[in-house]
Amino acid sequence: EEQAKRRPRKRRRRRRISPQAFPVLIALALIVLVGGFMTGKFLYNKYSPSKEMMDGNEYFGLSDDDSMAVIMNNELLEDKAKFIDGRVYLNVETVYQYINSRFYWDSTENLYLYALPTELVSVGVGSTDYTVAKATNSEDYVILRADGSDAYVALDFIKEYTAFNYEYWEEPNRVHVITEFGSKDVVTAQKASAVRNKAGIKCPILTKVNKGDTMYVLDEPEEIDEWTRVLTADGYIGYIKDKRISAVTKTEIAA
């Protein structure tokens, strides 16, 4: 029997891409690449933390070189101090309201007075001297300064008659005064982190903390999830992510 003849296989023709199609394909590829890039950029901008640093003078509301912000315990005051010749001077009204109401500013006589149980302390504007009863004493700095209708007293002088602690920093000028003592809530930074002006990763950074830095925990004006309001060791009040800090512990503040 004669073997069946094998039918030759038909060769498939390879489709060649028309030269006219290349520009279209390149354009489509570019559209995909640009679209992917724009999507990635959008997602990055939406979910990545801002690295913007807020200007310290703007945050503290400082308008000139000798102006100084005042953090009184856990509150940033609207009142401003003066930083002159390396010393902190508080407005006499700030002293009266927040530190010691027994100090009195006599604007008529330009005298600053303090009543001891049996004696009167008196100091004049621009003077390094002060009197206790009839005795004259001296400091190595100007105790009382005037600026228009305002008077400013050296914080070191107030400290001689009042129990409080204070610490100050420059650039920007700010002073932290502590008059409330006892047990305070604190947290510790678990890693290097940013403290922001408000609770949000897109909010400007006030300052940065390192691993192990301690911060005071402050009451929040409203309940905010995942963030804690803190006062940093360098005098900034802001917000830090909860996942970046330890659990709350207690510390004692002594005079």
Question: For the regions a protein language model found, what residue spans apply to each?
Answer:
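Conserved glycine-centered beta-strand/turn positions repeated across beta-sheet architectures
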Residues: 207, 219, 228-230, 237-240
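Glycine-centered tight beta-turn/hairpin loop motif at sheet-sheet or coil-to-beta transitions
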Residues: 118, 233-235
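SH3/SH3-like beta-barrel fold
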Residues: 114, 212, 227-232, 240
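Long, low-complexity, Ser/Thr/Pro- and Asp/Glu-rich intrinsically disordered
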Residues: 232-233, 255
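DE-rich, low-complexity intrinsically disordered acidic tracts
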Residues: 1-2
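Primary recognition of N-terminal secretory signal peptides and signal-anchoring hydrophobic helices
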Residues: 5-194, 199-221, 243-255
